[in-house]
Amino acid sequence: MPAVRGARPIRNSEVKEFHDSIIEPMPVTLERYASVWKEWMNYSDAKSLAGLDDFRFADYTQGTSQTFDQFILKHSKDREILVLRGDFQYHACLGKYVEFKYVSERNQLEEVLKGPGLHALLISAPFSDFGCMHPDFEEIMRICDVMDIPVCLDLAYWGIAKHCHIDLDFFPAIREVTCSLSKPFFTLENH
């Protein structure tokens, strides 16, 4: 049997009226989205993220890559962008166009610093290369705080992570937090 009307939905005013009568429309505002997102970030006992309420702004982007683009554009005017070796490869691609440096380990981080306020750092949690928190995460955040290095925290794999507990109140250098919905929910095809 051939598809009716080219497989398009059949418009039926009775069905639409019934549907509209049983479903209360709930507009998705940015405030509601941010609220649900913050709750979702802490839905599991296997991980926790405290301190999000202290961030003044919440927004959605076209994925974590757009956040990285914006962070790098914002800070590359007057800061060198730092990335730990083994982190997301996308950063290196952008590093071709800005002052950029890979850092192999925490000790090297201290060696490459040119002074306070001259760098910005992107770091993932769980760390891309390890699948868990970077073993030097807390010390790196301490260095960033002391040296006035703004940090973009990449939580792309947060939705499928375990054993990650971060209290943003302890890490004031973290100025931006981004996460991905495509990893835990496979939303890639919904763009």
Spans of features found by a protein language model:
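Gly/Ser/Thr-rich loops at beta-strand to alpha-helix junctions
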Residues: 61-67, 84-90, 128-129, 157-159, ...
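Short, charged, surface-exposed secondary-structure boundary motifs
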Residues: 92-94, 110-114, 186-190
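Active-site regions of enzymes building and remodeling cell-envelope glycoconjugates
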Residues: 94-108, 117-119, 173-180
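Active-site pre-lysine segment of PLP-dependent enzymes
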Residues: 37-49, 131-190
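Active-site phosphate-binding strand-loop segment of PLP-dependent enzymes
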Residues: 5-9, 89-90, 104-162
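Conserved N-terminal alpha-helix of the aminotransferase class I/II PLP-enzyme fold
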Residues: 1-66, 70, 74, 86
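A general structural motif
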Residues: 55, 77-80, 116-119, 146-150, ...
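Conserved PLP-anchoring active-site segment centered on the Schiff-base-forming lysine
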Residues: 71-92, 101-110
